[in-house]
Amino acid sequence: MDPQLTEVSQQFERFKAAFARKDYNTCSDLLSQLKVLLTKFTSLPPLFENSPNAAKELTIARDIYEHAVVLSVKTEDQDAFERDFFQLKPYYVDARNRIPQSPQENLILGLNLLRLLVQNRIAEFHTELELLSSATLEDPCIKHAVELEQSFMEGAYNRVLSARQTAPDATYVYFMDLLAKTIRDEIAGCSEKAYDYVSISDARQMLLFSSDQELLTYVTDEHPEWEVKEGFVVFQKAKETAPCKEIPSLQLINQTLSYARELERIV
C-alpha cells in the first residue's frame, strides 16, 4: 500500500478508537492531523486526479469527513458541523460515479436538514431538498426531517416534540432537543406577554411538558425571572411603556406656515 495511504489509515484507526471510548478531545486533535494528511492526496476534490489508489483515497477521505460531522454533533459544535459537511458534500455529489455510495450518506444528509431547520434557514432547507433524488426523499432519515419541518411550519408543536421518540438515529437527538427548546422559548415568550400568571397545570400543557417537575426545572434554568407560588407560575411583569408626550401640534403648524412664507419670499 502507498505509504501516505498507510499513514492516513493508521491515524484514522486511532481516531475511531478514541471516538469509541468517547475521548472527543483526542478525536479533535487527530482529526486536525488527518485533514492535513489528506491534502497530500491529489485524487480528492477539487482536483480528482487519476491515480492507482484514487478510489481508496476518496473512500477513506469521505469516511473521515463523515466521522468529523458526527463528532461535531457529539461536541455540540454547529459551526464545525457546517464546515465539515461542506467538505464532505463533494464526495456525495462530484465523486458519486467514482466510488460506491456511503451507507451513512442519507443519515448525514438528514442531519444537515435538521441543522438548517433548527437554525431557521428554511429557504436553504428546501434548496437542499431540491437536490435530492426521489429515491433519497423516501429514505427514513430524510422523511423524518421533512415531516418535522412540515409540523414545525404548521405549528403542530406536539408532533415536533413527539418526533424525538422516532428519530432514526441517536445523533438526531441533539438537534431535536435544540428544536424543542426553540419551540418552548417561543411559547414562553408569547405566554408572558399574554398573561400575568397561569396555573402550573396550564403552564405545563402550554409548554408541552409531561410532568410538573420538568416544567419547574425549565423555569429554574431558563426563566429565573418567573415566580412559582401557590400553584401558579407568575410571569415577569412587562415594563410599562412610558406615556407618549403630547405632540405640540399648534407649534408645528405655526413653524410650517413660517417656513412656507420664507420660501415664498425666496421664490
UniProtKB/Swiss-Prot annotation:
The protein's name: 26S proteasome non-ATPase regulatory subunit 8 homolog A
Induction note: By cytokinins.
PTM annotation (N-acetylmethionine): residues: M1
Function, as annotated: Acts as a regulatory subunit of the 26S proteasome which is involved in the ATP-dependent degradation of ubiquitinated proteins. May help to control the degradation of one or more factors that repress cytokinin signaling. Plays an important role for balancing cell expansion with cell proliferation rates during shoot development.
Gene disruption phenotype: Decreased rate of leaf formation, reduced root elongation, delayed skotomorphogenesis and altered growth responses to exogenous cytokinins. Increased sensitivity to heat shock and increased tolerance to oxidative stress. Decreased 26S proteasome accumulation. In flowers and cotyledons, epidermal cells were larger than those in the wild type.
Quaternary structure (record): Component of the 19S regulatory particle (RP/PA700) lid subcomplex of the 26S proteasome. The 26S proteasome is composed of a core protease (CP), known as the 20S proteasome, capped at one or both ends by the 19S regulatory particle (RP/PA700). The RP/PA700 complex is composed of at least 17 different subunits in two subcomplexes, the base and the lid, which form the portions proximal and distal to the 20S proteolytic core, respectively. Interacts with PUB22 and PUB23. Binds to the translation initiation factors TIF3E1. Interacts with UCH1 and UCH2.
Tissue expression remark: Ubiquitous with highest expression in flowers.
All residue ranges annotated as the PCI domain in the record: 79-251
